[in-house]
Amino acid sequence: MLRKLSPAVFVGVFLVLGNAAAGEWQTLEKCRLAPDQYMDGDSFHVLHEGKNHIFRLYFVDCPETDTSVPKRIADQMEDFGLAKDTAVVAAGQKAKEFTKKFLAGQFMVLTKWEDARGNSQQPRNYAVIFVGKKNLAEELVRSGHARAFGMPADYPDASRVKSFKDGLRRLQANAIRQKVGAFTGTSRGLAPTETAVPEREYVDYESEIGGQILQEGLNGLSIDFN
């Protein structure tokens, strides 16, 4: 007899296979931030035509709002030049408030429905967000509430991806020099000749979280074929 799979296993399998659904860019107009739902600076619930979606920003990473992912917290402490994990969390709360205010009205979502994993039981997908002509990712980095370090995408098109990412790295360098946002109390400095922060290879912490959920589900699975 085949025993019933636990909900955690179903979620884990979905997270692993979710990228198969990713395709062409789609535009969702007249979106709104879902009220009274979990969010942080770069991940939030969005309402569109009566449906609730969770989106995670491409290209950037905001400080965490809790310490549940120690590897990411440690990496953010170094990148933002913060001495304590509590400073990261405090900066994460400010990034959250920035995004909440930025998305107070209607906005546009561009997505390929690429799986962003995470630890929610609801599917989460990567996206680019616009309010008018303003790109949320760019504004977060400009204000020092995010770093130019995140899942890349072929946006705005394959030929211009590098210039877009280079622009984000220049915005981060400006935020460090101006000591704004998470860089207000930073110990990080830049040489006078540095016009952009160094490019870093992306580390997919989202996959690690999804893998942990799947493994937890598999560890609790018992199957009897007799």
Residue map of PLM features:
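Small beta-barrel nucleic-acid-binding modules, primarily SNase/OB-fold domains
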Residues: N19-N226
